[in-house]
Amino acid sequence: DGFECNVLQERQCIEAMQCMAKLHMAMRHLQTQQPYQADRLLEDFKRKDAELVRARNFMRRLSRKDEFTLMFLRAYERYWQQTKLAQSFLDAACLQALERKQLTEEMYVHGDMNQHNIIMLQGKVMTFRNFEKLGAHLQMKDVYFFMRKILEKNHWSVALADQMIESYAAITPVEHA
């Protein structure tokens, strides 16, 4: 019997990152029945932008606005500007280079990497479950989702973040993910 990765046990989180790095190495150039189809990163950014605009427009049209809606609308512009600034750093050429890298290395991701899908067996050995969202993407996507979940629960510990990245990078250099 196994148990889920405990987000408050730093050692388990670090070991989970090592296992994720090994999984990512194994998930490159998988032999599948379907041709490899990389995500289009530029299209993904545009889709996320459109979702944010739709959410804002929906909330603007509400006749009765609760406290959360009012706070969201007040904060929206500031976050929207930060989104645009972040996107300006990732110009089209940079994103196209990432897409080429993804296609060349045929990277796959778990797609739903969180503590609930990382199972500890006999203390240290781990396995992963729930691969329903497995797909072609930059593997940093899994790293991001897992780290965000863990760091939220650990008060955004910079020391833990450093250890997690170092443990992943010891197996799969971050620039290759």
Residue ranges and their predicted role:
Residues 3-8, 33-108:
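ATP-dependent phospho-/nucleotidyl transfer catalytic cores
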Residues 88-143:
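Active-site acidic catalytic loop and adjacent metal/ATP-binding pocket
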